[in-house]
Amino acid sequence: MAKRHAEENEDTVMSESLKVVDTDFINVDFEFFDPQPIDFHAFKNLLKQLLGYDHTNVNLSALADLILSQPLLGSTVKVDGNNSDPYAMLSVINLNTRRDEPVIKQLTSYIISRLAKSNSRLENELQKLLEPNSGSQVGLIVNERLINMPVQVIPPMYNMLLEEMQWAINENEPYNFTHYLLLSRTYTEIESKLMDDERPSKKGKKSKKTSGEEVMFFHPEDEQFREVAIDIADYPFANQDFNPDANRVFQDAGIKPQGELLLMTNEDFKNLVPKLMEIYSA
């Protein structure tokens, strides 16, 4: 799968594209591009979506700029050519070598604070990996797309990322990661309070939780990442003032969004990417 570069002329250069076919919708050709300055505002919006209610805890402009400072690493997906807004983005940030940059200090502090509330074991492990003398290199995977984007566009992005990181390593750039930390989002389905109020009470019978707090995925591929993860944290957003009826997706249920952090070894991540290509083949 080839990727278009900023300097390529759209009128004369054709890239490989991914055609997603769905019998219920029109066919769409998705093109892959390097991150470039024109993507700044779209990146900010995608990062805001990724961080959910906690997006105010991180300087999104600085984070978008940092990602754009690595133009040969990572991908965007567009449908209307190079000058259009990306529908998806993927990049990776070295949390060790960039530890002194203000936005990474801010982001790392936020991540640690959320782990302290949800998984102290993973909190301690990550802090050890990020110590200056740990000998480890942790790559933070930043992946987000518009809600209705087909998952089939994602595996090629990861496959290209592996290739780009290897090229960077060959040039002695700091992308030889020992671990990857995936930042993502999940949700649980919860019963509507409105339905509780409307439903007549029944003596001697307690209401049962609608989903048993089953974790659901905004990103389907996260299910495969969880299978190979060293550790997992599903954490509540710090700024969440939650009303289940503001996020109702079914007649009798709402959704409760939450953050997700997955820690993986380099080997497990690299081995999983080809499997994602098979599972979600277009």
Swiss-Prot record:
- Where in the cell? Endoplasmic reticulum; Nucleus envelope
Keywords of the record, alphabetical order, are: Endoplasmic reticulum, Nucleus, Protein transport, Transport
Which Gene Ontology CC terms are recorded?
cytoplasm; endoplasmic reticulum; nuclear envelope; nucleus
Record flagged with keyword Transport = yes
GO biological process: what's one of them?
Answer: ribosomal large subunit export from nucleus
Assigned protein family: Belongs to the BCP1 family.
Q: What does this protein do?
A: Involved in nuclear export, actin cytoskeleton organization and vesicular transport.
The name under which this protein is listed is: Protein bcp1
The major lineage groups are: Eukaryota, Fungi, Dikarya, Ascomycota, Taphrinomycotina
